[in-house]
Design a protein with these regions (language model features):
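Bacterial Sec-dependent N-terminal signal peptides
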Residues: 1-23
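Residue-level detector of conserved, function-critical positions
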Residues: 21-204
């Protein structure tokens, strides 16, 4: 009889204790995008699902997106931008909805995914000579505006010549801007010399 009473009380208590969850002292709660909302606390962001469960814990590497007049991280096609600092230079990559890094931070800038593609600035290192006295390679860096797939592979180069860049924090204090924009799934516009636009059609 005593065991039955204890079991009965446990059945009553468990649903009550498990039915509510509070997340306190939040600075901001975003609207839902793809059934996930960003929440901010003490300078870090996390993601909750539609029943208020934290599915990605608070972290400081999530990249915010401008939505109207407000900035907050979003998932777009199951990818969210992240940022990592290496030698005081920002590199961008992506996580999936489990919080796993699926595209390692490697781009000098990157955009959200749209129709299975995203714009990014891919960094290329060119070894042009070798300093025999110092036993060091002489290298130059440039970046290309590319269209990547959801695995981070560059599918198309929108500016094949690239843009020379000095990979130093004193010269690269902010991420370079992405000048291209997506017009449709297979059509992109790239701003070249004299601020003129070039339309580029890529393979589906």
């Amino acid at each position: 009889m005593k065991k039955a009473l204890i079991l009965f009380l446990a059945i009553l208590i468990i649903p009550i204790s498990g039915s509510s969850q509070e997340i306190e002292n939040l600075d901001y709660i975003s609207p839902f995008h793809e059934d996930l909302a960003a929440i901010k606390k003490e300078g870090q962001w996390a993601f909750i699902n539609t029943i208020g469960e934290i599915i990605i814990d608070f972290r400081d590497d999530l990249v915010v997106t401008s939505v109207g007049d407000i900035n907050y991280p979003i998932f777009s096609e199951d990818r969210c931008l992240i940022e990592e600092q290496k030698d005081d230079i920002s590199y961008f990559g992506y996580i999936d909805t489990s919080g796993k890094t699926v595209i390692a931070p490697q781009f000098l800038n990157a955009a959200n995914f749209n129709e299975e593609r995203a714009l990014a600035l891919k960094l290329i290192k060119d070894v042009v000579a070798k300093n025999e006295a110092l036993e060091k390679n002489v290298v130059y860096y440039k970046y290309h505006e590319v269209v990547i797939d959801k695995n981070g592979e560059a599918k198309d180069y929108l500016n094949p010549k690239g843009v020379n860049v000095v990979l130093d924090k004193d010269f690269l204090k902010e991420p370079p801007q992405i000048t291209a924009k997506q017009i449709s799934k297979t059509l992109y516009a790239f701003k070249g010399k004299h601020t003129k636009w070039t339309l580029i059609r890529i393979n589906d």
